[in-house]
C-alpha cells in the first residue's frame, strides 16, 4: 500500500489535516445537509411551494410520502399533452437548461457556467474521494492518490475558471442592470457573494502554495490555513447550507421539471 497522502489544508505546515479529520468535517456537513433536505421534503409534502415559507398550522408533511408522490408523477404518463421523455428532460432541460436559453442567452450562459463549473468540481472531488477510499481498503490502483490529485489539477483549474466567469457575470448583472439590481434581495447577495468567496479562496489558496498568479506575494506559510479556510467554507456553504437557503432551487427546480416532464 502506498504512503499516506499529505493534504494541503491545515492550521500550519506542521499541523496538516488528516484523512480522518477531513472525513469528520465532511460527515458533519453531509448530516446537516440531509437533515435540512428532510425538513424541506416534509414542508413540500405539506403543500409548501415557496422559499422560507412554513406549512399551515396543524399541517405536517411526510418526507417519504412526498418522495413517493414525486416519483409517481415522474413515471406516470403525461396528461397535459406536452410532456417530454425523461432522458430528454434530464439532458436538455436540466443539464443544458434550454428553457433559460429560450428566454435569455446571456442569462443562460451565466447559469450554465455556474452550474457546469460547480457540479464538475463537485464530481472531481467525488472521484478524488473514491480513489482515496479505494486505497484505504487496500485495493491496488495503477496510480497513487497523490498522482491522481495531480492529474485532476488541470480540469480543476479549467472548471474553476468556468465557475468564476459565471459568478462574475452574475455579480455584474446585479450591480449594473437596474431591473436585476432592484429585484435582488439580501438572500440573493449572500448566495452569489458566498459562491464568489468560495471560488476566489480556492484560487488564492492554490496560488499561495504554488506561487502561480493568485498568490499575490503572500507568505507560503499561509498556504495551509488558506486551504483550510477554503475547505471548510466549501463544505459548509456549498453543501450544509444548501437546504436552508435559496440554494435549494438547484435541487427543487430539477425535481419540479422532472415531475412536470419538462412542462412549464
Curated annotation (Swiss-Prot):
GO MF annotation terms: CoB--CoM heterodisulfide reductase activity; metal ion binding
Keywords: Cell membrane, Heme, Iron, Membrane, Metal-binding, Methanogenesis, Oxidoreductase, Transmembrane, Transmembrane helix
EC numbers, comma separated: 1.8.98.1
Cofactor: heme b
Membrane topology term: Multi-pass membrane protein
GO cellular component: plasma membrane
Catalysis performed (reactions): methanophenazine + coenzyme B + coenzyme M = dihydromethanophenazine + coenzyme M-coenzyme B heterodisulfide
Oligomer and partners: The dihydromethanophenazine:CoB--CoM heterodisulfide reductase is composed of two subunits; HdrD and HdrE.
Biological role: Part of a complex that catalyzes the reversible reduction of CoM-S-S-CoB to the thiol-coenzymes H-S-CoM (coenzyme M) and H-S-CoB (coenzyme B). HdrE may be responsible for anchoring the complex to the membrane.
Protein name, as recorded: Dihydromethanophenazine:CoB--CoM heterodisulfide reductase subunit E
Source organism of this protein record: Methanosarcina acetivorans (strain ATCC 35395 / DSM 2834 / JCM 12185 / C2A)
Classification lineage: Archaea, Methanobacteriati, Methanobacteriota, Stenosarchaea group, Methanomicrobia
Amino acid at each position: 500500500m502506498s504512503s499516506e497522502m499529505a493534504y494541503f489544508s491545515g492550521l500550519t505546515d506542521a499541523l496538516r489535516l488528516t484523512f480522518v479529520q477531513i472525513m469528520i468535517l465532511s460527515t458533519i456537513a453531509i448530516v446537516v445537509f440531509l437533515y435540512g433536505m428532510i425538513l424541506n421534503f416534509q414542508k413540500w409534502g405539506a403543500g409548501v411551494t415557496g422559499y422560507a415559507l412554513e406549512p399551515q398550522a396543524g399541517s405536517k408533511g411526510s418526507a417519504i410520502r412526498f418522495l413517493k408522490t414525486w416519483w409517481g408523477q415522474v413515471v406516470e404518463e403525461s396528461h397535459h399533452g406536452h410532456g417530454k421523455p425523461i432522458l430528454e428532460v434530464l439532458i436538455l432541460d436540466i443539464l443544458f437548461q434550454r428553457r433559460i436559453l429560450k428566454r435569455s442567452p446571456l442569462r443562460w450562459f451565466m447559469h450554465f457556467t455556474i452550474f457546469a463549473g460547480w457540479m464538475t468540481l463537485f464530481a472531481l472531488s467525488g472521484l478524488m474521494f473514491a480513489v482515496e477510499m479505494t486505497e484505504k481498503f487496500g485495493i491496488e490502483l495503477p496510480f497513487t492518490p497523490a498522482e491522481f490529485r495531480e492529474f485532476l489539477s488541470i480540469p480543476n483549474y479549467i472548471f474553476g475558471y468556468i465557475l468564476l466567469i459565471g459568478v462574475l457575470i452574475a455579480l455584474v448583472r446585479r450591480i449594473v442592470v437596474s431591473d436585476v439590481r432592484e429585484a435582488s434581495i439580501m438572500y440573493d447577495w449572500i448566495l452569489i457573494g458566498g459562491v464568489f468567496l468560495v471560488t476566489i479562496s480556492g484560487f488564492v489558496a492554490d496560488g499561495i502554495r504554488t506561487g502561480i498568479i493568485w498568490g499575490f506575494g503572500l507568505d507560503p506559510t499561509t498556504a495551509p490555513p488558506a486551504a483550510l479556510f477554503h475547505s471548510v467554507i466549501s463544505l459548509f456553504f456549498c453543501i450544509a447550507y444548501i437546504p436552508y437557503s435559496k440554494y435549494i432551487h438547484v435541487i427543487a427546480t430539477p425535481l419540479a421539471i422532472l415531475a412536470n416532464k419538462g412542462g412549464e
